[in-house]
């Protein structure tokens, strides 16, 4: 007998019941293909070994190996059956000046306990999370998971796209990325016709139509369509933020957010719009920006029919109908529909203005205001009126301008029924009914109900 047996379990990948249930048929087929490739690699080993043994595989053994592989390759697509591997691979044996292998694999078919039960190639007895990363202490239940995780620390990205030279840590990421260049979207939703590059994206998308939210938080009961959304949400309860920026110390709950954040320091904007040349830190921002040019608004409110360019805009809008304001300020008790609004509001109390203009040094309490301000320096006016061609720095300015052409006056006075195209015009008008005069002259104390009236009055003193 040869010493130091290499069992098939050393290269096999096992799935738990829960993990297997999450795989679609294409992913399960991929699993079988990978496992069979491993079988083939083991059979065809021709490596040097310190072990010498004169026993050779017989022709009958080799025939059994090849026949078994062909048989399993043909029949493994049946997910209603389980296949187990019995036998071991001995280390390469030396004989007649070359190295050969001795391996007998017998596939045994047995009925599955239920449809979709994961194949168990070998029952392992590792303790849960027994593979620990020496860099950050994070633990994993399987060795291959640790190997994949360590690439985050080393920065290793061995899989490079030939089209754009972008590199990836894992081969499946490259495969998915390449569909961007080919434009391939083979997975189509039967309800709305929207197509996707990946089957998993279609499964998640279908939950929009069905309303299914299978991932529920045990702490607060909130449910989510996707597992990663639940994982991210749970970090709000635990306060866990594993990924820290070495430049500024800011921490993040997800690694991709850290990667995007680092581009703020480096100035890198790899995603460029082909229509106007504007570049972005992340790809999702480019996709959303393109809708300015196309006019696409794919997210529609079922209550009022209003459509939006982003799904988070729709989610925020829907709170108007429900009246939900779950985010409350601990300082003053003011409540907000959205968490981001609360964060911005809290800066009023703290005086924090973290967003600084590199041109003039002016600081702002939210990034959106800085983005708008920077257009003053660049002269960029991305919002153009289709009627007259006039362009604006801000989208809100375009919306107000378009009312000149449409004649829309959405702000109506409840006292007299008079309508206005702008909210501030209604506010000023309502002072006529209330008698409020909020603009007072510092010279003589006279009060006016409109700011422009006060300015006209002040000319008397200046003259």
UniProtKB/Swiss-Prot annotation:
Cross-referenced SMART domains: KRAB (SM00349), ZnF_C2H2 (SM00355)
Domain KRAB: 6-78
A GO cellular component entry from the record: nucleus
SUPFAM superfamilies the record matches: beta-beta-alpha zinc fingers, KRAB domain (Kruppel-associated box)
Gene Ontology molecular function, alphabetical: DNA-binding transcription factor activity, RNA polymerase II-specific; RNA polymerase II cis-regulatory region sequence-specific DNA binding; zinc ion binding
Subcellular location: Nucleus
GO BP annotations listed: regulation of DNA-templated transcription
Principal place of residence: nucleus
Tissue: Testis specific.
Keywords for the protein's UniProt record, in alphabetical order: DNA-binding, Isopeptide bond, Metal-binding, Nucleus, Repeat, Transcription, Transcription regulation, Ubl conjugation, Zinc, Zinc-finger
Zinc finger (C2H2-type): 131-153, 159-181, 187-209, 215-237, 243-265, 271-293, 299-321, 327-349, 355-377, 383-405, 411-433, 439-461
Position of the Glycyl lysine isopeptide (Lys-Gly) (interchain with G-Cter in SUMO2) cross-link: 109, 400
Entry's family note: Belongs to the krueppel C2H2-type zinc-finger protein family.
Annotated PANTHER family: KLUMPFUSS, ISOFORM B-RELATED, ZINC FINGER PROTEIN
Purpose: May be involved in transcriptional regulation. May play a role in spermatogenesis.
Protein's recorded name: Zinc finger protein 331
Species of origin: Homo sapiens (Human)
Gene of this entry: ZNF331
